[in-house]
Regions:
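Extended, low-hydrophobicity, polar/charged segments
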Residues: 1-127
């Protein structure tokens, strides 16, 4: 997040980080896109998803999304990947998600990010 913010000359919070979690089984992955300064609140995650927050290993992230950690893209993901956007992003007009590699990003309005990510819904799972 810090390096991306420096490269783009924006505050770190505007970097939209995509976090990868285990879904209900081995064939499903949950992506949560948050503001760069946000942290997952385990209690809120458990309440919303009805399961414990379990982040994927770097190997499983690459297998599930096709991207390495640091470059996970919130859009154009394979079947079985469900994407949610955290409300921590909504304080910004535009944010910068990764585009599939650790050295790529695109500036998007939050409504564009929601649409392009085929997001299921806005959620509140961060501190």
């Amino acid at each position: 997040v810090e390096l991306a913010a420096q490269a783009l000359s924006v505050e770190p919070a505007r970097i939209a980080k995509t976090l990868s979690f285990q879904g209900e089984d081995e064939n499903h992955c949950i992506l949560i896109v948050t503001a760069g300064d946000a942290k997952i609140d385990n209690s809120k995650f458990r309440h919303f998803f009805k399961m414990k927050a379990r982040m994927l290993s770097p190997e499983k992230v690459a297998e599930s999304t096709g991207h390495a950690i640091g470059g996970v893209c919130p859009f154009a993901n394979p079947e079985g990947v469900r994407t949610y956007l955290d409300i921590s992003l909504q304080r910004f007009d535009t944010v910068f998600p990764a585009c599939g590699s650790s050295n790529s990003a695109i500036e998007l309005h939050c409504d564009e990010l929601f649409r392009y990510a085929l997001a299921i819904q806005w959620i509140d799972v961060c501190k």
